[in-house]
Every structure is written in structure tokens, then in C-alpha cells.
């Protein structure tokens, strides 16, 4: 008689209550170790590794080419699905716990992998996957990768420059949009296109 239970809403309520009431424990290593660990990538995997290693007392430095911590949590997932503040408070917890972030640092271009190996006792590679699988279909000139579209939309939402959005290439306003796929990423594209004012949005799914 009480209707459905929205698990996501319950989990969010519990999590928000924990943060508000101070139940989320700070990172406090039981022992400080002298060994340093370099982590390449500040996305979900890199952040998880940083927390686990720092909790065990290692000195952790996370390198990322972007200017914000979070990877696809920040740039790939729309704000209506995951608020950026959720990622930012996790980042602050890591910083308060002693994790160091080196942002705008492109490994290989700005610092060599050999230098990282020489600087740290170990290096964790947590770069994620940003390259899309091409469709390779005839006349695919108007096809854009979902991640490119979502990243541009997120950058606009963050107040960053997004040339491909400004030029109209990755702006769905007044466009007839077709999204191929029916997974989470496809739904993010559908909802983003609608919010941008697309003339129509059609989802093709097998």
C-alpha cells in the first residue's frame, strides 16, 4: 500500500545524512610509511586506489591531465545524474587525508613515465578509456562519439570553454538527434539532447 521503493533515493538519503552528520570518517593512516606511490589518472579507479593506499600509510601523488579531479565522474556523467559537489567533497576528503594531486599534468608529454618510476617506489596506471569505438558505417560524417558530446555538455555546465559546443557541432539545440544504443551512456545523451533543446530525439536500440 506504500508504492514502490526507489532504492537510489534511499541510498542517496543515507549517504547525504552520513556526510551531514559527520559519520564519514576522515582518512587517518594507522602508520605513516616512507614509500611513495604515483597514480596516473584521477578518475574513479585512481581515486579508489589513492584512498586505499593512503589509508595504509603510503605517500600518494595522483597525476591527471585535466584541471579537475574526477575523470569521467566530472566530465562524462551529466550533472543531473551525478552532482559535481559529490565528487568534489570526496576529493577534499582525500586532500585532507594527505593525498596530493598534480593536475594539468599529461604523463609522457609533461613528465616521462621513466621519471615517475624514478620518483616513486611504485606507479599505478588508472587512466580509464576515453577513446570511442568507431561505428564504421557509410556516410557517418555527422556521427559524433557519445563521450565527446557529453564531455562538451559537462564543460559548458562547469563554465569551461567548449569550442565544439560553441561552433554548434556538439550542441543539439534545434537538431534532429538520433542516439544509437540503449545503455546508460545512450540515455545520458538522450536526456542531455532534450535539455539542450533538440527538435527531436530518437533512440535506436536492438
Predicted segments with their positions:
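Charged, alpha-helix-enriched surfaces in structured cytosolic catalytic cores
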Residues: 5
